Amino acid sequence: MAGMKEIRGKIKSVQNTRKITKAMEMVAASKMRRAQERMRAARPYADKVRDIAAHMSSATPEYRHPFMVSNEGAKSTGFILVTTDKGLCGGMNTNVLRATLQKFKELEGQGKTVEATAIGGKGLGFLNRLRAKVVSNVVQLGDTPHLEKLIGAVKVQLDMYSEGKVSAVYLAYTRFVNTMKQEPVIEQLLPLSTEQFEAKDDKDSPTPNTSWDYIYEPDAQTVVDELLVRYVEALVYQAVAENMASEQSARMVAMKAASDNAKTVINELQLSYNKSRQAAITKELSEIVGGAAAV
């Protein structure tokens, strides 16, 4: 009977765990839908700013913004690492941190030191364990990222590049592909490539065959400067939004897998309990029959 009591205790424990994982799965599914909506809503803004900046840059070809000038001579490299603040999201953080570590080794092989910005608690902890130089960080963004919370940390990297202190700035995050798939990516944020700002005049452009004619206040250079900063900030925000959509998707999938595994364990324990109970009943019946035969 002690064995049966122990099995009953295990069944109850796993059932309680399954209730928790099932609830977390439902919460993650709800948050995932909202995160995907924010991610999709952020894309048109960055695209529009890029298109306007492209046309304005072509209107002032003699001016080259610092973000579009290479700093090859600098011995340091900027790096923005986007991760989650919480765990229980499968191997999502592990994958992007593994890719980041590989990139760090590659940069080290080129004689570059890394000056990093961490967005998310998991990434900050990782960088601290590596004893990497963390120049800025932002954690506890919550379920809804706000650009004003990111600007301060990101501005540190932008200023370092504008001042020629870093040769490039990289951005690492988890790209949302679909609910079942998320992939770690590392993109070069700065310097901006000229291809990004080639003026488009085709059906894919939001304003095809349109003549752009602006009156600049105070002047075109100032407006371009401001637009390019906004564009880079929008790229970082888009990465954070994609990372959050990936987080909720990965968490939902992980909690569903945990719930399914818990159900399998419960079924196996229930089978063991039934076998133990059957054996105990058979033993009692055998003892009764044996006693009756002795009488």
Curated annotation (Swiss-Prot):
It comes from the Bacteria. SUPFAM superfamilies: ATP synthase (F1-ATPase), gamma subunit. Gene3D superfamilies: 3.40.1380.10, ATP synthase, gamma subunit, helix hairpin domain. The keyword Cell membrane applies. It is a peripheral membrane protein. Its main location: membrane. InterPro entries: ATP_synth_F1_ATPase_gsu (IPR035968), ATP_synth_F1_gsu (IPR000131), ATP_synth_F1_gsu_CS (IPR023632). CDD domains: F1-ATPase_gamma. GO terms for biological process: proton motive force-driven plasma membrane ATP synthesis. It is found in: Cell inner membrane. PANTHER family: ATP SYNTHASE GAMMA CHAIN (PTHR11693), ATP SYNTHASE SUBUNIT GAMMA, MITOCHONDRIAL (PTHR11693:SF22). Produces ATP from ADP in the presence of a proton gradient across the membrane. The gamma chain is believed to be important in regulating ATPase activity and the flow of protons through the CF(0) complex. F-type ATPases have 2 components, CF(1) - the catalytic core - and CF(0) - the membrane proton channel. CF(1) has five subunits: alpha(3), beta(3), gamma(1), delta(1), epsilon(1). CF(0) has three main subunits: a, b and c. This is ATP synthase gamma chain. It comes from Paraburkholderia phymatum (strain DSM 17167 / CIP 108236 / LMG 21445 / STM815) (Burkholderia phymatum).
